[in-house]
A protein has these predicted regions:
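Vicinal oxygen chelate
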Residues: 1, 79, 88-133
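N-terminal beta-strand motif that seeds the catalytic metal site of vicinal oxygen chelate
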Residues: 1-19, 74-79, 129-133
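Core segments of cupin and vicinal oxygen chelate
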Residues: 2, 9-52
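Residue-level marker for the onset of beta-strands and adjacent loop->beta junctions
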Residues: 6, 40-41, 75, 111
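Short amphipathic alpha-helices within nucleic acid-binding modules
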Residues: 21, 85-90
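A short, acidic/glycine-rich surface segment
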Residues: 31, 60-65, 100-101, 133
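Helix-adjacent hinge/juxtasegments
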Residues: 55, 67-75
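Mid-chain, well-packed structural core segment of small domains
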Residues: 70, 77-85
Length: 133
């Protein structure tokens, strides 16, 4: 199984300020922006070859009682694979617990799934990019 780092995803109060910071400080490039991605503004920026997803807080999101800061900050990190369903089988065989089974609902119609790591950390398993690269 060939795993590779895919992206970092921030959830924040001010998407534009977060994107502006990366553009200004690191000379990152905004490669997409959606003012309403499932209820919140969302942007993808490119820093070198690394993608950073930045999303606003959705109206129905509230902090978790165990992790009150979970709604903001680092949401998850993504690991790219060629085939999400095959990777899911491989990971399940090793004891991975899935919080989201493979489904095609990621940005740009990508196949995604999520596994839960210790300390309530989410790891997204994502298929190849369909839209932006």
């Amino acid at each position: 199984m060939d795993f590779k780092f895919d992206h970092v995803h921030f959830v924040c109060r001010d998407v534009d300020a977060m994107v502006d910071f990366f553009e200004r400080i690191f000379d990152a490039k905004r490669i997409s922006y959606n003012p309403d991605f499932n209820g919140a503004a969302s942007a993808v920026i490119l820093l070198g070859s690394m993608r950073i997803f930045v999303r606003g807080i959705r109206a129905d999101e509230t902090p978790d009682a165990v992790a009150p800061d979970r709604v903001q900050g680092l949401d998850h990190f993504g690991i790219g694979v060629d085939d999400v369903e095959e990777a899911a089988k491989w990971l399940k065989a090793r004891g991975a617990v899935f919080s989201v089974e493979p489904v095609r609902r990621g940005m740009g119609g990508r196949m995604i799934s999520y596994i839960r790591a210790p300390e309530n950390i989410d790891i997204e398993i994502v298929g190849p990019y369909i839209g932006h690269k």
